[in-house]
Amino acid sequence: MKKWSILLMLTAFAVILSAAVQPVKPGEKVLFFGDSITHGGRYIAFFQLILDSRGITGTDMMNAGISGGSATGGLRRIQHDVIARKPDRVFILFGMNDVGRWRYKTDSPQNLQNRKNRLETYTASQKKIIAMLKAAGITPVLMTPTAYDQYQKDETDNLRCNEPGLSDVADIVRKLAKEENLELIELHPYMTDMLKKHPDLQLCGKDLVHPIHVGHLVMAALLAEQTGLAGPVADVTIPVSGKVQSRFAAISGLKTAPDRVQFRYEPERLAVDLSIKIYNVEIFKNLETIYPFHEKMNRETLRVTGLADGNYSVKADDKELGIFSAAQLNSGIDLGKLETPNRARSIQAMKSAWAFYNASSKPRGLVQCRLLIASGKYGTPAPGDHQAVGEALDKWLADHKPDWPYRKYYTTVVNNYKKNAPQEAAMEADLIRAGKKLQEDARPVSYTVTIEKTR
């Protein structure tokens, strides 16, 4: 924790040079503009979950990521994919595809020149993106890139040399934030530090580029921290005699005695469930080793002081949560770890966040395919003419050699377009429903707490 605090202080100094990141306001529309890391959208869904579970109501976290995207490529779609959607703020996350990681394998004169050229192109494109957003009355927010996981203990044959390129990108982003007086979100230093400290615990996949589930939750947590959302779910102290102290929860109907306390507990926030399994695998199993999520975001403390010595039954409504000593209650118990009525809601909210992620990432494949044929070389079909777009995509795919290394991937992308495009309107409706359900499920319920000495 000490090393983490030092890193936080050093990075905070860099952030001071840019504008302070403003909290997300109720009803705010925020769009995330980036590459495949954003296209997948898990960190966006997790961030939406954190906002909803903390009562920041009516927000809309929108996905404008495209697999293989770059800052230069972003310029070609910014008008229809970003500005036309009328967000209040746009969080910009490019860099991974801009540097050309194969250029870092050796320090040949040609590679050194190519690195320089690519970074200059990236800088120029980012400046144009910033200018276009400002001209449209939209606030740009810059994000340093995620880390390149060249430290993981894996025998995968992939380039393990790209971190200097991403560090250069991070420096460019910081410089632009300072020059333009823009808000800045730092991902790169924190995630790089985690990877270096825990090479045995993968934060990214075997391609060393794309964060896995736990990496996306770390991204969301860093976003939450830097937009002012860190802190407990609740922190409540109830003395048997004296004044109640409470953060993020209301206490009503309080009745106290030396061996019995009862009250109505009305929390404002909901803990984030970390127990979810995908294909029977605990996807957040190693989270606390990498990032102190519970301490920073998930603690829900209830203290009861002044009780007579002994053991006490703690109940939520009529359900017993456990037996605790007076000393334990005096120090504080963590309601977020107990089977309160909100435990089930927390589990459901994470499932709803997962549904929101699926609903928000699926339409991005349609945008991706339309961009593949945007040059007009394969015709200029209307976006809504799904059959004509599919035929143009077939021509585009046929233009690539059979041994093209990305043929299998793009064949799947094109086939998915043909399958999903006719349901585009239904997909958009599903996304709206998924967002509403997540907001509903992420709200806590109130319940009666009874603490009584056991006989």
Give short role names for the model-derived ranges:
Residues 1-4:
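Positively charged n-region of N-terminal signal peptides that target proteins for export
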Residues 6-7, 374:
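General helical structural elements
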Residues 7-16:
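Bacterial N-terminal signal peptides
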Residues 8, 34, 94:
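Residues that line or immediately flank small-molecule/substrate-binding pockets and catalytic motifs
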Residues 28-42, 67-70, 99:
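Catalytic nucleophile-elbow at a beta strand-turn-alpha helix junction centered on a G-D-S/GDSL motif
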Residues 32-33, 63, 142:
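A structural signal for the hydrophobic beta-strands that form the central parallel beta-sheet
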